[in-house]
Amino acid sequence: MSDLNTKNVGKISQIIGPVLDIAFGQGQVPNIYNALTIKAKNAAGLEMSVTCEVQQLLGDSCVRAVAMNPTDGLMRGMEVLDTGKPLNVPVGKSTLGRIFNVLGEPVDNLGPVKNEESLPIHRTAPAFVDLDTRLSIFETGIKVVDLLAPYRRGGKIGLFGGAGVGKTVLIMELINNIAKAHGGVSVFAGVGERTREGNDLYTEMKESGVIVEKNLIDSKVALVYGQMNEPPGARMRVALTALTMAEYFRDVNKQDVLFFIDNIFRFVQAGAEVSALLGRMPSAVGYQPTLATEMGALQERITSTKDGSITSIQAVYVPADDLTDPAPATTFAHLDATTVLSRGLASKGIYPAVDPLDSTSTMLQPWILGEKHYGCAQSVKRTLQRYKELQDIIAILGLDELSEEDRLVVARARKIERFLSQPFFVAEVFTGSPGKYVSLAETIEGFNKILAGELDDLPEQAFYLVGNINEALTKAASMK
């Protein structure tokens, strides 16, 4: 706003927790989604700055807005400035290596962002004519993912797993691999999760080289956090802030972007809180009536265009393990693949602990992947499934009671299970073994050799934590 006379100023008329009613002059009502700012002193004389977003027009020149900051200390009668536009956040290379809040303000104590460009967080999804409709697989360099539950370029993947099974390390490896193999960048949205987890992720990213402290612009990721101690408005909008940064890398820099949301359930949960505060009638299980619309508006912006792609990996919390709960059920409708992490595999020391039988992908079709890849994946799954069925018999009677054919299946399945493990680049500092990126062709070649029985004479330990099959052969030779 250039001069004071053109400013549109209203006054707070009612405060209900994080929801504010604001009265404006006749004919000066701000638009829905406009950002409003309140700069004032509270009763203790301390400076306050609160940003809120218009959600409803109440009539009589009154609007109802949801605050993005805590509203403690606000009073009726305080002046509210209409910025005349939606929330704008910084975008571009200068966001890499930094941590932002929902308003696009850096919160990592590294000073302001030197930035030329900013974009509004509310944007329309790309038009259909701009979309890239080709079905192509997004190679991650992680054997178990690429072979058995491949990601779609520009697709959406659900990441399921409890605490301590390796979600964070898998996320960091994906960030590292997209930067090295695809020249892409990543944006991480921490939506309504613990502050401690956000801090741990940031620290681990610095240790593993995903964030380069000496020269932040060489970092591979931008972080946007709206933690669970923040108002529901911030948690509801933080995913859009991060998505806006990701869209810039896709549309302007024409890059492949990995977009992480941890956790998509908290996005829905925040929307439910805001919906109730705005006085909307709740729908099933107390969720907002606009649940599918809100989820659709976010998910439709995550897509591939002819310029670049946003491939999204979303951690999904399932309340009370009920997959029919409206929040996870609505999320599933948008997912192209699921990566399920297994505590059983993690306890065996097989990392990444991706469950090869529970993880799924819509890309696992012969007409998309080709017969060679599809046939190999199906044979691996068949072998592992048979091993799973035989485990009870082995536990009771032992291996010797199995038929010759079944013993061969078990031996190959154990080799496959170990060959699905892989040393990660980001874990080098902890494990001491160098990370490996395995191309899809090498992955298929390796598993086909195991399935064909070419490597039946090798010890199964030779397949544990190696990259391609040649490394397994080298390891076996060194073990003799």
Curated annotation (Swiss-Prot):
UniProt keyword annotation of Chloroplast present: yes
Pfam family, one: ATP-synt_ab
Binding site for ATP: G161, G162, A163, G164, V165, G166, K167, T168
EC number(s) given by UniProt: 7.1.2.2
A single MF term (Gene Ontology): ATP binding
Compartments in which it is found: Plastid, Chloroplast thylakoid membrane
InterPro entries noted in UniProt: AAA+_ATPase, ATP-synt_VA_C, ATP_synth_F1_bsu, ATPase_a/bsu_AS, ATPase_alpha/beta_chains, ATPase_F1/V1/A1_a/bsu_N, ATPase_F1/V1/A1_a/bsu_N_sf, ATPase_F1/V1/A1_a/bsu_nucl-bd
Keywords: ATP synthesis, ATP-binding, CF(1), Chloroplast, Hydrogen ion transport, Ion transport, Membrane, Nucleotide-binding, Plastid, Thylakoid, Translocase, Transport
A single GO BP: proton motive force-driven mitochondrial ATP synthesis
Cellular component GO terms, alphabetical: chloroplast thylakoid membrane; mitochondrion; proton-transporting ATP synthase complex
Annotated Gene3D superfamilies: 2.40.10.170, Bovine Mitochondrial F1-atpase, Atp Synthase Beta Chain, Chain D, domain 3, P-loop containing nucleotide triphosphate hydrolases
Reaction catalysis annotation: ATP + H2O + 4 H(+)(in) = ADP + phosphate + 5 H(+)(out)
Membrane association type: Peripheral membrane protein
Cited PROSITE patterns: ATPASE_ALPHA_BETA (PS00152)
Function: Produces ATP from ADP in the presence of a proton gradient across the membrane. The catalytic sites are hosted primarily by the beta subunits.
Assembly mode: F-type ATPases have 2 components, CF(1) - the catalytic core - and CF(0) - the membrane proton channel. CF(1) has five subunits: alpha(3), beta(3), gamma(1), delta(1), epsilon(1). CF(0) has four main subunits: a(1), b(1), b'(1) and c(9-12).
Family statement drawn from the similarity comment of this UniProt entry: Belongs to the ATPase alpha/beta chains family.
The protein's name: ATP synthase subunit beta, chloroplastic
Organism per entry: Tetradesmus obliquus
